[in-house]
Amino acid sequence: MEIILGIVMFTVIVLVLALMILFAKSKLVSEGDITIKVNGEKELTMPAGGKLLGALANEGIFIPSACGGGGSCGQCRVVVKSGGGDILPTELSHISKREAREGCRLSCQVNVKTDMDIEVPEEVFGVKKWECTVISNDNKATFIKELKLAIPEGEEVPFRAGGYIQIEAPPHTVAYKDFDIPEEYHEDWDKYNLWQYVSKVDEPILRAYSMASYPEEKGIIMLNVRIATPPPRVPDAPPGQMSSYIWSLKPGDKVTISGPFGEFFAKDTDAEMVFIGGGAGMAPMRSHIFDQLKRLNSKRKITFWYGARSKREMFYVEDFDQLAAEFPNFTWHVALSDPLPEDNWDGYTGFIHNVVYENHLKNHEAPEDCEFYMCGPPIMNQSVIKMLKDLGVEDENILLDDFGG
């Protein structure tokens, strides 16, 4: 009798647990189709599940997301008027309390579970997707490649200088030992044993890159991509997924991009423009400066200050030398933070924010009237911003492409 009672009790418990699981699933797991109303006009019907960022992309509405949907960049903002659930803690570091009350959400964090009514920026409807072909993918510095893509014939990416595109990568496995890297850069790669790394990605990924090309360079998109290797103090950390993929690309390979996006645009004034860059932050600097001089024929005073580690890390030197020779309103300067003995360097040395201050802004009659455009590693950006604040430069004249943020 006790055995039979035990079996009955066990069966009842199993049935209760099964019913609880089914009930929880009905509440937590979405099934069937839902409808998303966009900007009060367009209605999208789609299967429930996934995140709003991806769901909109599947319908051809590409919301900018520099981090590819990881919740770290804070750029994929939409307004959720109804549906979408409560705002998540991961969103609150990017969205103020006032914005949250107005329905602002990060689309990469919003679950598609119920019908929704949302608002997106009108400019996203001008965003398109292209399958491009790799023209070249050459080292410009030890850890920076210039990826040059051909846009499909008859197509055009209508971007503004300082804008960016998003690049997609399929699931892949990339071995660093297979990278095509010129001999002149092997010293550092050998020193840090970077050839050992392998990047394995099981799902499609998306990342944003500022363009080094400017609008008059028709038919191509140029990017400067720094390889994201594990830091020396954490050698077991995984390497950067997208940068590893991009570094593996070869001429003829197909690459999917979407865009254009951006907000790091030049102001339409006559103020002096001071560009400050470092590392792969060269990309939007080149785009802006070429656009101002070659396309707009700007008469504004323009200076460019670039920080590099050694002479080996300098690139586009001939391009900027030619601009300086052709346009009397443009000058450019490089500061090396760690020049090598063989560099025989007699130019500026030290960190770029100090060099800009000592050699340009210290005795400038009105630095607060200049416009400052910067892009570089986070520590460079922070140092430059502090220096500018100390000089009395207002926020509205400090424009930052924060690719490291």
UniProtKB/Swiss-Prot annotation:
InterPro entries: 2Fe-2S_ferredoxin-like_sf, 2Fe-2S_ferredoxin-type, Beta-grasp_dom_sf, Cbr1-like_FAD-bd_dom, FAD-bd_FR_type, FNR_nucleotide-bd, NqrF, OxRdtase_FAD/NAD-bd. Its main location: membrane. Residues 32-124 form the 2Fe-2S ferredoxin-type domain. Residues 270-387 are annotated as: Catalytic. Binds 1 [2Fe-2S] cluster. It comes from Neisseria meningitidis serogroup A / serotype 4A (strain DSM 15465 / Z2491). One of its GO terms (cellular component) is plasma membrane. Residues 127-267 form the FAD-binding FR-type domain. This is Na(+)-translocating NADH-quinone reductase subunit F. Belongs to the NqrF family. One of its GO terms (biological process) is sodium ion transport. Its EC number is 7.2.1.1.
